[in-house]
């Protein structure tokens, strides 16, 4: 049995406890497709078996290029189960940037998914590198190279004995954006995650429900360490559901339907929210209304409900 120190151990606990409860929620137009904790566990185990069948080296580096989606989470979990190291990238890289990072990251296999210009990007993938492609999403590229997601998963049985990482093992390599020069890979071990978990448990600054009653919404790039820890790692570690935005046009609708209990945002998102509010109420009038305590309280509640934040216990920026 693994020690209760790495996030995969907690995933197995939630999987057992919440086997038939919703975990990953993916929007498709007006509909949401839901994977339960049990289904995600089975998909990840089958994928892990498939990865091991490819004869990769020990501690192989597995690249991942895709916008946020359920397959991203399953692939990341399978990489851990198989005993490999994830190397995620921004989904909008050019072919030259992809080639550079695949080389710097010493990547052995690439998951390619929800991207918009694969025809240009694939030129940066070294010849002969194995590829596993996600299902095609509306508005994104149809990737026909390599192993197809469901075909590959369904060829394999669930991995019976997933890898049991130690705190000192490398978990992931996160590349910087490279805006100030060549991108640099930051190597993180499982201890980094455990330290975050301990801090959350001690302070509960995120107002997490430790019984698994949490709702997360993922839209910022998962290859960025902040989204990876505050959203992906948090749901693995503390339980709940994780929903995604379908695209930029549906962001507001998807957020409103999700009503997350923990919401992580960057300044440009707040600017977008502000512009939406000011398009309905002029700044001068809004400022006057917010100075009246009762009206201020009512307006803030209405704004939060309209934005999809009425159930948010914690808003992080």
What label would you give each PLM region?
Residues 2-23, 42:
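A short N-terminal helical cap/helix-turn-helix that marks the beginning
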Residues 34-38, 171-197:
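Conserved AMP-binding A3 loop
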Residues 22, 154-175, 182, 208-215:
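Conserved pre-ATP/AMP-binding loop-to-beta segment of ANL
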Residues 194-218, 222-311:
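Conserved AMP-binding/adenylation subdomain of ANL enzymes
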Residues 23-69, 73, 77, 94-99, ...:
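Conserved AMP-binding/adenylate-forming core of the ANL superfamily
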Residues 61, 67-87, 91-95, 103-109, ...:
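A short helix-loop-beta submotif of the ANL/AMP-binding
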């Amino acid at each position: 049995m693994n020690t209760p120190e790495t996030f995969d151990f907690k995933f197995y606990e939630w999987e057992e406890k919440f086997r038939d409860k919703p975990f990953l929620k993916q929007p498709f137009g007006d509909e949401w497709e839901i994977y339960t904790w049990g289904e995600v566990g089975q998909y990840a185990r089958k994928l892990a078996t498939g990865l091991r069948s490819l004869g990769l080296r020990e501690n192989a580096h597995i690249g991942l290029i895709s916008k946020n989606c359920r397959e991203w989470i399953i692939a990341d979990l399978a990489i851990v189960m198989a005993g490999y190291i994830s190397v995620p990238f921004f989904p909008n890289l050019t072919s030259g940037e992809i080639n550079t990072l695949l080389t710097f990251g010493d990547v052995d296999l690439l998951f390619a998914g929800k991207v918009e210009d694969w025809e240009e990007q694939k030129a940066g993938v070294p010849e002969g590198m194995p590829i596993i492609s996600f299902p095609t999403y509306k508005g994104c590229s149809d990737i026909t190279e390599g192993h197809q997601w469901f075909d590959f998963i369904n060829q394999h049985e669930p991995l019976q004995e997933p890898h049991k990482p130690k705190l000192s093992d490398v978990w992931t390599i996160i590349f910087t954006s490279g805006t100030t020069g060549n991108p640099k890979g930051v190597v993180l071990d499982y201890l980094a995650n455990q330290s975050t978990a301990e801090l959350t448990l001690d302070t509960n600054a995120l107002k997490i429900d430790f019984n698994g009653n949490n709702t997360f919404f993922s839209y910022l790039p998962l290859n960025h360490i902040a989204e990876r820890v505050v959203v992906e790692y948090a749901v693995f570690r503390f339980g709940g559901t994780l929903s995604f935005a379908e695209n930029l046009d549906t962001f507001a609708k998807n957020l409103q339907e999700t009503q997350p209990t923990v919401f992580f945002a960057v300044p440009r998102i707040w600017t977008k929210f502000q512009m939406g509010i000011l398009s309905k109420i002029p700044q001068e009038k809004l400022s006057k209304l917010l100075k009246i305590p009762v009206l201020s309280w009512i307006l803030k509640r209405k704004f939060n409900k309209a934005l999809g934040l009425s159930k948010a216990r914690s808003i992080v920026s």
